[in-house]
């Protein structure tokens, strides 16, 4: 607890806002492929989407250092969080077929840029002796979101798969965008 309260600077901002990512994306991820199937996307298309997503991540990963150096860590994190998370969440929320998921998968690969810049922000104000604690706090913050998984299950059982997942993607858009603003 003292590590959490003693954080300062960018490390504090990264750790304190990390649960917002978990609360948005971890609720919807277990339903993503089933949602695609419900919209008529075939198994082999889901596999193709996964492959294209990975290729997009490789390309963005290769460019991430240059982009982060050019734009700076904060601006890169803000811009590419919007590109990699907010925009795809909106696309997924209104998705009708394979093509929506394809566009979102390519755009979502940009999270590799944010991962690079965010990791730099996370550690730049943290002393070497505190690094392990900071990474542990980030991991704990992400896992904390698992406590809210029953909310997604309740939404699916109450409203049905398609409307509930669309709502969860809209929720992810709102929370991720708020995380970026904060």
Located regions from the model:
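Glycine-rich segments within core transmembrane alpha-helices of 12-TM secondary carriers
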Residues: 136-153
């Amino acid at each position: 607890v003292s590590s959490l309260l003693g954080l300062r600077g960018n490390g504090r901002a990264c750790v304190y806002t990390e649960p917002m990512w978990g609360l948005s994306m971890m609720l919807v991820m277990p339903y993503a492929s089933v949602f695609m199937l419900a919209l008529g996307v075939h198994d082999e298309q889901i596999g193709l989407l996964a492959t294209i997503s990975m290729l997009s991540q490789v390309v963005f990963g290769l460019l991430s250092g240059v982009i982060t150096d050019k734009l700076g860590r904060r601006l890169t994190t803000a811009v590419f969080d919007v590109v990699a998370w907010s925009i795809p969440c909106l696309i997924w929320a209104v998705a009708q077929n394979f093509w929506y998921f394809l566009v979102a998968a390519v755009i979502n690969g940009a999270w590799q840029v944010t991962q690079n810049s965010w990791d730099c922000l996370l550690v730049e104000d943290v002393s070497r002796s505190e690094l392990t604690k900071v990474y542990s706090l980030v991991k704990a913050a992400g896992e904390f979101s698992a406590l809210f998984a029953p909310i997604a299950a309740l939404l699916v059982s109450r409203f049905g798969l398609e409307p509930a997942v669309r709502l969860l993607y809209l929720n992810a858009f709102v929370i991720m965008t708020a995380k970026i603003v904060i």
